[in-house]
């Protein structure tokens, strides 16, 4: 005999109802996972127990993206079919949608901070762990990239400073060479000026013996400036002195 169909009705026994809920929920999540893998579909399941406990399942993409996609499509369809008189109703629905989204984001934020984890299933905890691992990978990758860029920038600055120092050192050496050459040239000029000049060549002149014996001699002029006597005047004086005895002798002869 074939197995009879099970009548669908509410289970009155609380324990049996809880056990059945756990089994059917696990089977539902399993079927959702199978259809997502086999058919490459994005699946999101949200289940609340009779006590108000939340159970959810989503594919590799997070629940928020799937819900945002659902809201976007459903809102666009409602905008197409809604008459203009239902503007207030649409605003109310938009408010409810945004409010639910805010609550979901706040709950996920608490989960990311390690809070309110008691109501999460092992599968949900595993998904949360994967999301945190992915976020940590992105954070570490970005941090390593920033550190690598910082090291490259410091190396570039160090190379520029070394090149600048080398250029300055080269300029200093060239300047020192120029100063040394100028100093040597200056020393040579000073040495040439301090050397005594050679005496002028002597000219051999034939002079009269009398003139050789009567060379002008310097004399001391007390209380005045020294003035050199004119050579022509000195010569005339010498001639007068030499002729005076002869002149006196002649005068004596005439007197006799």
Curated annotation (Swiss-Prot):
<dbReference type="GO" id="GO:0003700">
    <property type="term" value="F:DNA-binding transcription factor activity"/>
</dbReference>
<keyword id="KW-0217">Developmental protein</keyword>
<keyword id="KW-0805">Transcription regulation</keyword>
<dbReference type="InterPro" id="IPR002100">
    <property type="entry name" value="TF_MADSbox"/>
</dbReference>
<dbReference type="GO" id="GO:0046983">
    <property type="term" value="F:protein dimerization activity"/>
</dbReference>
<dbReference type="GO" id="GO:0000977">
    <property type="term" value="F:RNA polymerase II transcription regulatory region sequence-specific DNA binding"/>
</dbReference>
<keyword id="KW-0287">Flowering</keyword>
<dbReference type="InterPro" id="IPR036879">
    <property type="entry name" value="TF_MADSbox_sf"/>
</dbReference>
<dbReference type="Pfam" id="PF00319">
    <property type="entry name" value="SRF-TF"/>
</dbReference>
<keyword id="KW-0804">Transcription</keyword>
<dbReference type="GO" id="GO:0005634">
    <property type="term" value="C:nucleus"/>
</dbReference>
<keyword id="KW-0238">DNA-binding</keyword>
<feature type="domain" description="K-box">
    <location>
        <begin position="88"/>
        <end position="178"/>
    </location>
</feature>
<protein>
    <recommendedName>
        <fullName>Floral homeotic protein APETALA 1 C</fullName>
    </recommendedName>
</protein>
<keyword id="KW-0010">Activator</keyword>
<dbReference type="Pfam" id="PF01486">
    <property type="entry name" value="K-box"/>
</dbReference>
<comment type="subunit">
    <text>Homodimer capable of binding to CArG-box sequences.</text>
</comment>
<dbReference type="InterPro" id="IPR002487">
    <property type="entry name" value="TF_Kbox"/>
</dbReference>
<keyword id="KW-0539">Nucleus</keyword>
<dbReference type="GO" id="GO:0045944">
    <property type="term" value="P:positive regulation of transcription by RNA polymerase II"/>
</dbReference>
<comment type="function">
    <text>Transcription factor that promotes early floral meristem identity in synergy with LEAFY. Displays a redundant function with CAULIFLOWER in the up-regulation of LEAFY. Required subsequently for the transition of an inflorescence meristem into a floral meristem, and for the normal development of sepals and petals in flowers. Regulates positively B class homeotic proteins.</text>
</comment>
<dbReference type="InterPro" id="IPR033896">
    <property type="entry name" value="MEF2-like_N"/>
</dbReference>
<feature type="domain" description="MADS-box">
    <location>
        <begin position="1"/>
        <end position="61"/>
    </location>
</feature>
<dbReference type="InterPro" id="IPR050142">
    <property type="entry name" value="MADS-box/MEF2_TF"/>
</dbReference>
<keyword id="KW-0175">Coiled coil</keyword>
<dbReference type="GO" id="GO:0009908">
    <property type="term" value="P:flower development"/>
</dbReference>
<keyword id="KW-0221">Differentiation</keyword>
<dbReference type="GO" id="GO:0030154">
    <property type="term" value="P:cell differentiation"/>
</dbReference>
